[in-house]
Amino acid sequence: MKIGILSRNQSLYSTSRLIEAAESRGHEVKVIDALRCYMNINSEKPQIHFKGEELVDYDAIIPRIGASVTFYGTAVLRQFEMMGVYPVNESVAITRSRDKLRSMQLLSRKGIGMPITGFASKPDDVKDLLDMVGGAPVVIKLLEGTQGIGVVLAETRKAAESVVEAFMGLKANIMVQEFIKEAGGADIRCFVIGGKVIAAMKRQGAEGEFRSNLHRGGSASLVKLTPEERKTAVAAANIMGLNVAGVDLLRSERGPLVMEVNSSPGLEGIEKATGKDVAGLIIDFIEKTAATKRTKTRGKG
């Protein structure tokens, strides 16, 4: 097969592992920087050009689109979909999962467990907003944040009010969540491919750090999931419409709580923590599904 990987840097661990896994199975692979693509969208024959050449005859596309380039990256992916190329994750599913408010509303509607969460833009009563989620301590997040950036633990009501007011001064949309103390600064990343959890790791925050992101100095280790955790992770990925997803859970006294569903989960942490060939499993999934062109929206979303 001819497989394209939408990525801005082929030396990144995840991208290089996907190249390695695909080539070892005899596939032709090309890394495509979505920002350098340009498209003809007003033609009966939709086209994508990259470095002066038309991109043709691709069987599948693997989107590794960074959060900062979601708008244009998903536009390019949508164009591939319109050309009949099989997307590992569809453009509409990626945009759905990248919108934190929309994704949490969808998960809530389907009864998925989550921390009590408040959303706000310019709350005229910060005290009432905090009361809504049970009061301090609370976790306050910028809606556009990634990798633990823009996430603050406010341990007192006064601190929480100050952080909310500071974020309001930035004209930023915010999310206020209850703090799950029993999680102990750890979360679980479940890696879902094709409706199955194929690997899972526990991420523990550095000492004195409540954020468990590996980018913030956290550590990762193999973890055994409960049946409920496995079921929750698969359901969350399915609700987003993602074939490949990283579902982040917290262990709480009331069961697993979903924090986020990531449409472009990194491979380095999960492969090193579990010893599994996750990149190879993604290519295996493409081999089984690309020929059938099983895509729900066909680029209409």
Swiss-Prot record:
SUPFAM superfamilies linked: Glutathione synthetase ATP-binding domain-like
InterPro entries noted in UniProt: ATP-grasp, ATP-grasp_RimK-type, ATP_grasp_subdomain_1, RimK, Rimk_N, Rp_bS6_RimK/Lys_biosynth_LsyX
BP GO terms, sorted: protein modification process; SOS response; translation
Residues where Mg(2+) 1 binds: D248, E260
Binding site for ATP: K141, E178, F179, D187, R211, S212, N213
Entry EC number(s): 6.3.2.-
Coiled-coil ranges from the UniProt annotation: none
EC supergroup of this enzyme: ligase
Pfam families (alphabetical): RimK, Rimk_N
Residue positions binding Mg(2+) 2: E260, N262
Binding-site positions, Mn(2+) 1: D248, E260
ATP-grasp domain segment(s): 104-287
Cofactor(s) the record lists: Mg(2+); Mn(2+)
UniProt: Mn(2+) 2 binding residues: E260, N262
GO molecular function: ATP binding; metal ion binding; ribosomal S6-glutamic acid ligase activity
Cofactor binding description: Binds 2 magnesium or manganese ions per subunit.
Keyword Ribonucleoprotein included in the entry's annotation: no
Domain of life: Bacteria
One Gene Ontology term, aspect cellular component: cytoplasm
Family note: Belongs to the RimK family.
Name of this chain's protein: Probable alpha-L-glutamate ligase
